[in-house]
């Protein structure tokens, strides 16, 4: 079985980090190949730099799409964000498989009638336990850990959206809509070394205690491969 996955790239990795870690599409490819292991599923990837206005000529070029994170906010008045919201609505209307990550999670809500805003609780950083609420069996019942890096949160849901999980500061940390959209506020594509270097570069943005706790949390293993396997299974259904 082959799955063609379009990666909708919504940002560029900081140049000094990209040299070591690659761009976001490479991180997702690494994650999903590792999660796929030695199964009989063949994964094919194509990147579309949506932050530069690049899109597939036809939605059905791909079997599924992943919408990456971004330093931008979905509520910014930028032409590329407006165009991206329109594309998300098109995917939804066609019931095309879409997995949204961080900014992508927020864009799904924003584009389909929900709301994302700056979180009153401030930054969500570091490895955080993510607790399923058992609304479906999609995530199972056991808490899992992901690396987080966000200041915005989804605060209102589009009609029909089901909340799958939450963290200590993020009530809407994972969602699903129908059988074709899945989203996570956390970053399954992030690994500790990259998060460590990213937080260090951005440390002046963070309150000292949040930064300190986030850096310490990176000593805790996260469940990237668990979520990566979920993403593959979701895309193949």
Language-model-derived ranges and their functions:
Residues 112-193:
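Pocket-forming structural segment of enzyme catalytic cores
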């Amino acid at each position: 079985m082959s799955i063609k996955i379009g990666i909708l790239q919504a940002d560029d990795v900081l140049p000094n980090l990209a040299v070591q870690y690659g761009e976001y599409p490479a991180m997702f490819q690494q994650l999903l190949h590792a999660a796929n292991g030695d199964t009989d599923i063949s994964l094919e990837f194509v990147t579309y730099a949506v932050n530069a206005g690049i899109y597939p000529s036809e939605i059905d070029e791909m079997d599924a799409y992943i919408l990456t994170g971004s330093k931008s906010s979905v509520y910014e008045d930028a032409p590329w964000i407006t165009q991206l919201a329109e594309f998300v609505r098109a995917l939804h209307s066609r019931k095309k498989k879409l997995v949204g990550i961080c900014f992508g999670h927020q864009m799904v809500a924003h584009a389909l009638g929900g709301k994302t805003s700056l979180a009153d609780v401030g930054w969500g950083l570091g490895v955080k336990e993510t607790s399923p609420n058992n609304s479906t069996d999609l995530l199972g019942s056991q808490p899992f850990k992901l690396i987080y890096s966000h200041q915005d949160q989804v605060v209102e849901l589009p009609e029909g959206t089901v909340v799958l999980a939450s963290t200590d500061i993020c009530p809407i940390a994972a969602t699903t809509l129908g059988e074709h959209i899945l989203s996570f506020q956390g970053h399954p594509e992030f690994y500790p070394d990259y998060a460590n270097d990213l937080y260090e570069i951005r440390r002046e943005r963070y309150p000292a205690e949040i930064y300190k706790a986030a850096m310490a949390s990176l000593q805790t293993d996260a469940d990237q491969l668990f979520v990566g396997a979920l993403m593959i299974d979701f895309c193949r259904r």
